[in-house]
Amino acid sequence: KAELHTFISKESNPSFSLGFVPTMGALHAGHLSLVSAALAENSLVVVSIFVNPTQFDNPNDLSSYPRKLTEDVQLLETLSKPHILVYAPTVEDVYGSQPTADHFDFGGLEFQMEGKFRAGHFDGVGTIVKRLFEIVQPKNAYFGEKDFQQLQIVKKMVEITQLPVHI
């Protein structure tokens, strides 16, 4: 985290704009599209690669989630490497010794659609996005629209916490 802040502060100037694309890795064309959009609008883009344990209700799903950090970094290098910073924290970096999710009142949105079948999933999503926003401190953050419910959850979390991040 300290290295991330040191690097970003060296790059910072009055016209500096930091974009952020949070991912769980296993990057694909959709992720690259988000990173490209972020590169077009920001001085520097941080791409996080973090498999978040608090959004999995099934430990088998967590353990079987693909982790391809080397391949993901190579894929990002096909874009504009000098303007992309990969942040791949450990669970301890983000949560300390005990990964737990915060509870958010998403106004019932968390119980609709996918939320009906994945208890606590969106508290985990809200928690990790909030923590990553606090660590990275971006001006702009980019999320795919494919997962409409998750996008709405993130927007609601930003509204609740009043974090100064444009989605």
Please report, for each region that a protein language model flagged, where it lies by residue.
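Nucleotidyltransferase catalytic core that binds NTPs
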Residues: 1-167
